[in-house]
């Protein structure tokens, strides 16, 4: 009898759901939307999921690439950021459309249309991508805590585990609270870099010219490598899974054509607006790198280098001050914290969607966090908290994102182009072929970037 009770408790803690379970069940359809309201009131109701998705496009993993791009080639790579952002808008709109029309997220759809063995394989690949994303966020947060409070890196890494408790509290308060907290953190990042760029006084005409693509991006090997880094970091695999799930947090009747159509319209507007904000932040990072570090011998390849440079008048000139350095660290912490919230949600979506593993929220999020914290902690202990060595881990973590990209993009384009799945909401011909072209280019660029990172291509 006692053994049966123990078995029952284990099954309650960890069990496998049937395939019909909803994505992020605790918040699915939890946000009411008006039915006969005007444009702005309706948009306000749908605004929120886009900001959670946009966070992935300005996480700590993107910072170094953008700033280094500006420091090395001034404003020339702004065009790459623009093109990358437009690609992200298209793919994220497709992810949201998939979730709204089918009521299934990308992980669930992929699992539904593959064998059990293939589903398990895809889960492992995607889980590694989540870990890679989380590693960048943990490292960014831990370094920010050290810069702000002189906290040992190992202690900072352990403290980031507490994000799980914050997320649990926010989930109890409602999904809109999560959206509000993340939006506040993103606003902090935007304001900090806008302020620092204004102080840096960039050359505006030259800056605007940087948004026009030019041949040097392809012909110059160093410029091409940094461009690949920017593009490779733009489309984050976990964001496609996340977007397809949280688009379902708005309560609609999928049997009513007009409600589905309206949900797609306003979710796409929300996504594009928030990704525009991410585009602005990434532009500001590159502009800051160009205005302050172009033509100097200063290294800006690491967070600590950037922090120190902002208070060094020999590098950044008269605007140098400890305040600029502190603001940079605050923005880094805000970026890390906002990204960990969305990364943990994506981890839950992927685990439940691919292998139908259902766990209590605290166990699910603790497991997701520990899977990412553990390798960083081991690395930090092994290298005695050396920042340079730990930031190298951040660089290599991006390789996993590149490996996982095809396993997210290809199914997304397949499912959203299939009329049997999407009905009349399937991709139009020009959207489908544009998406396939973009997917092919992204995959080739990422494979090339992997080969360069691992030293197979010089």
UniProtKB/Swiss-Prot annotation:
Species the sequence originates in: Lacticaseibacillus paracasei (strain ATCC 334 / BCRC 17002 / CCUG 31169 / CIP 107868 / KCTC 3260 / NRRL B-441) (Lactobacillus paracasei)
Keyword tags: Cell membrane, Ion transport, Membrane, Symport, Transmembrane, Transmembrane helix, Transport
Protein's cellular compartments: Cell membrane
GO BP: any one term: iron ion transmembrane transport
Lineage: superkingdom: Bacteria
Recorded GO CC terms: plasma membrane
Spans traversing the lipid bilayer: 38-58, 76-96, 119-139, 151-171, 180-200, 223-243, 275-295, 315-335, 370-390, 393-413, 437-457
Position of the signal peptide: none
DNA repair keyword on record: no
Predominant location: membrane
Name of a matching Pfam family: Nramp
Known function: H(+)-stimulated, divalent metal cation uptake system.
Stated name of the protein: Divalent metal cation transporter MntH
MF terms in GO: cadmium ion transmembrane transporter activity; manganese ion transmembrane transporter activity; metal ion binding; symporter activity
Membrane topology: Multi-pass membrane protein
Protein family per UniProt: Belongs to the NRAMP family.
NCBIfam families in the record: nramp, Nramp_1, PRK00701.1
Record-annotated disulphide pairs: none
């Amino acid at each position: 009898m006692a053994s049966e009770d123990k078995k029952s408790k284990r099954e309650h803690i960890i069990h496998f759901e049937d395939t019909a379970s909803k994505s992020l069940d605790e918040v699915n359809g939890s946000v009411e939307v008006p039915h006969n309201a005007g444009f702005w009131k309706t948009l306000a109701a749908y605004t929120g999921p886009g900001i959670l998705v946009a966070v992935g496009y300005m996480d700590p993993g993107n910072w170094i690439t953008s700033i280094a791009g500006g420091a090395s080639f001034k404003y020339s790579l702004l065009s790459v950021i623009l093109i990358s952002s437009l690609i992200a808008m298209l793919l994220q709109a497709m992810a949201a459309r998939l979730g709204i029309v089918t009521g299934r997220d990308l992980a669930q759809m992929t699992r539904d249309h593959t064998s059990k063995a293939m589903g398990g394989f895809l889960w492992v690949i995607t889980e590694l991508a989540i870990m890679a994303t989380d590693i960048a966020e943990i490292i960014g947060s831990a370094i920010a805590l050290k810069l702000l409070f002189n906290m040992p890196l190992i202690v900072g890494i352990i403290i980031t585990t507490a994000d799980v408790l914050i997320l649990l509290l926010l989930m109890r308060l409602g999904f809109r609270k999560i959206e509000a907290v993340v939006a506040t953190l993103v606003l902090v990042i935007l304001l900090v870099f806008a302020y620092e760029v204004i102080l840096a006084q960039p050359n505006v005409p030259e800056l605007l010219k940087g948004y026009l693509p030019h041949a040097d991006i392809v012909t110059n090997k160093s410029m091409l490598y940094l461009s690949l880094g920017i593009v490779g970091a733009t489309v984050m695999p976990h964001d496609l899974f996340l977007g397809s799930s949280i688009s379902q947090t708005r309560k609609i009747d999928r049997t009513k054509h007009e409600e589905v159509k309206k949900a797609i319209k306003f979710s796409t507007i929300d996504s594009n607006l928030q990704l525009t904000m991410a585009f602005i932040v990434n532009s500001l990072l590159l502009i800051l790198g160009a205005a302050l570090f172009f033509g100097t011998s200063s290294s800006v390849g690491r967070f600590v280098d950037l922090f120190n440079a902002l208070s060094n008048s020999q590098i950044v000139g008269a605007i140098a001050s400890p305040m600029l350095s502190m603001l940079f660290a605050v923005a880094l912490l805000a970026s890390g914290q906002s990204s960990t919230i969305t990364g943990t949600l994506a981890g839950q979506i992927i685990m439940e969607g691919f292998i139908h593993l259902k766990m209590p929220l605290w166990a699910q999020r603790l497991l997701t966090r520990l899977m990412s914290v553990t390798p960083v902690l081991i690395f930090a202990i092994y290298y005695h908290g050396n920042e340079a060595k730990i930031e190298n881990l951040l660089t290599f973590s991006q390789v996993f994102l590149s490996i996982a990209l095809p396993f997210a993009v290809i199914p997304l384009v397949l499912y959203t182009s299939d009329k049997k799945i999407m009905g009349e909401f399937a991709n139009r011909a020009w959207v489908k072929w544009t998406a396939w072209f973009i997917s092919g280019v992204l995959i080739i660029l990422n494979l090339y970037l992997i080969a360069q990172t691992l030293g197979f291509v010089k």
